[in-house]
């Protein structure tokens, strides 16, 4: 990792927050299709952010999450299950953090790094989830694409992070589990680290991926050598 790093910027959904925990908490009610429904919900949520961006038809991420869940429930014939959609949406506001998230953020902050989130989520849903997971106590900043009314991986989002944090692209370590996000961030000029929990193959090879680890806990050893530069 380069010596000039000043900020560690994290994606939220899928990186720090487990997007599948909402369905898993309600798995008994959802039934045998719980895992598949959760995967489809996430896929459509992301797809809708990209298609709306291309069509210049912005809607905030909470609305996209709602629309994606509607489709997923219809797909698995659960749309008439009384109260299920409301319970799943409420659970999404309180997603579980990955077990190693808080400790990793605390170590980085103690070492002098600016610790921030850059997310497609709108502020209300982000703040609710971060408060529920207690990650809000560790962050220096939480930046939302909703401020610009566009979604990652548009390069303007990554520039927005630089402007708000007062750093240059080469001074940012950007951490995400999402390959498409890292593709955009890497092409913009961030130093990128992929949290590849599922061991997925490389993607977006036109954009430089600096490092890959299997968990958030592996991030600290990767960055520890730079602590004197960050402080």
From Swiss-Prot:
GO MF annotation terms: (S)-2-haloacid dehalogenase activity
Keywords in alphabetical order: Hydrolase
Residues at the active site: 11 (nucleophile)
Coiled coil: none
InterPro entries, A to Z: 2-HAD, HAD-like_sf, HAD-SF_hydro_IA, HAD_sf, PGP-like_dom2, S-2-haloacid_dehalogenase
Biotechnology (record note): (S)-2-haloacid dehalogenases may be used for the biodegradation of halogenated substances and their derivatives which are widely used as pesticides, herbicides and other industrial products.
Sequence segments annotated as region (Important for catalytic activity): 176-181
Biological role: Catalyzes the hydrolytic dehalogenation of small (S)-2-haloalkanoic acids to yield the corresponding (R)-2-hydroxyalkanoic acids. Active with 2-halogenated carboxylic acids and converts only the S-isomer (or L-isomer) of 2-chloropropionic acid with inversion of configuration to produce R-lactate (or D-isomer).
NCBIfam families in the record: HAD-SF-IA-v1, HAD-SF-IA-v2, HAD-SF-IA-v3, HAD_type_II
Family label: Belongs to the HAD-like hydrolase superfamily. S-2-haloalkanoic acid dehalogenase family.
Protein's name in the database: (S)-2-haloacid dehalogenase 4A
Gene: hdl IVa
């Amino acid at each position: 990792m380069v010596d000039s790093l000043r900020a560690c910027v994290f994606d939220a959904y899928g990186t720090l927050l487990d997007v599948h925990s909402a369905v898993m908490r309600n798995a008994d009610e959802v039934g045998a299709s719980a895992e598949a429904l959760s995967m489809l919900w996430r896929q459509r949520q992301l797809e809708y952010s990209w298609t709306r961006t291309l069509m210049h038809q912005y809607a905030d991420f909470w609305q996209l999450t709602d629309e994606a869940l509607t489709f997923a429930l219809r797909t698995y014939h659960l749309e008439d299950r009384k109260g299920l959609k409301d319970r799943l949406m409420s659970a999404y506001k309180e997603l579980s953090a990955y077990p190693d998230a808080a400790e990793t953020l605390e170590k980085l902050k103690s070492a002098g790094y600016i610790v921030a989130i850059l997310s497609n989520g709108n502020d209300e849903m982000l703040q609710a989830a971060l408060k529920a997971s207690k990650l809000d106590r560790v962050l220096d900043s939480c930046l939302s694409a909703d401020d610009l009314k566009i979604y990652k991986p548009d390069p303007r989002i990554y520039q927005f992070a630089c402007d708000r944090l007062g750093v240059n692209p080469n001074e940012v370590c950007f951490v995400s589990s999402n390959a498409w996000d890292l593709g955009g961030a890497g092409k913009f000029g961030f130093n990128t680290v992929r949290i590849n929990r599922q061991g997925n193959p490389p993607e977006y090879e036109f954009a430089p991926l600096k490092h890959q680890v299997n968990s958030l806990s592996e991030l600290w050893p990767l960055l520890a050598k730079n602590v004197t530069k960050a402080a």
